[in-house]
A protein has these predicted regions:
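Alpha-helical transmembrane segments of multi-pass membrane proteins
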Residues: 1-205
């Protein structure tokens, strides 16, 4: 019985790590593709990339804070599944937002800085917040299964950083070139749905 419990805990820890790694990778996939998506409307400049990096980091920070509070209030695996699924939905929705907002901003008299910020904020702030929730939420769940606090926190943050690195290089060097920007965003959303599913089915318990 104890062996079975240990095996389940080990599988849960592995899956939490996979989810943190992949969600962090997806966030950077969205960040890199954001530059490509808004380039036809505001170009590629210091202003556009400042907006992209700033907005996504702001969303990530807010998500980390919310995720920590949610975890302290008892957020469990179902909460993680909900967040991942919503992140997938809002990632798809970002493409629809661009379709509607582009004509409005193009016909406005907004300067480049304001337009860049509005594009990125309306498209990617919410997905960034949702993805930011994942790491503190799952790290807290992992700490309930392994008392080695430093080991678990360090591992999860390392996986998040590694996922971000892989997501950055994979998108910039390979994914966009071979699949196109919109398909990459759709693929990222699909990946989030796949990550969310086991949490609803409670496979990692």
């Amino acid at each position: 019985m104890n062996q079975s419990t240990d095996d389940k805990s080990r599988l849960s820890l592995i899956w939490y790590g996979v989810a943190i790694f992949m969600s962090s990778a997806v966030l950077l996939v969205l960040e890199i593709t954001a530059g490509r998506l808004i380039a036809p409307y505001v170009g590629v400049s210091l202003y556009s990339w400042t907006s992209i990096i700033g907005v996504i980091l702001a969303g990530l920070s807010l998500g980390n804070w919310l995720g920590g509070r949610w975890a302290d209030k008892g957020g469990g695996e179902t909460a993680a599944g909900i967040v991942l699924a919503l992140a997938g939905l809002t990632s798809i929705f970002s493409l629809l937002v661009l379709t509607f907002i582009a004509p409005v901003l193009q016909s406005s008299m907004l300067d480049l800085i304001s337009a860049s910020f509005i594009y990125v904020f309306t498209m990617f702030f919410v997905p960034s917040v949702l993805l930011g929730v994942v790491t503190p939420l799952l790290t807290t769940l992992a700490l309930k299964l392994d008392v080695r606090t430093g080991h678990i926190v360090g591992r999860m943050h390392a996986l998040a950083a590694l996922g971000s690195i892989i997501g950055t290089f994979a998108t910039g060097y390979w994914l966009v070139q071979y699949f196109g920007t919109r398909n990459v965003v759709l693929g990222a959303a699909f990946c989030l749905f796949v990550l969310a599913a086991p949490f609803f089915r409670r496979v990692p318990t």
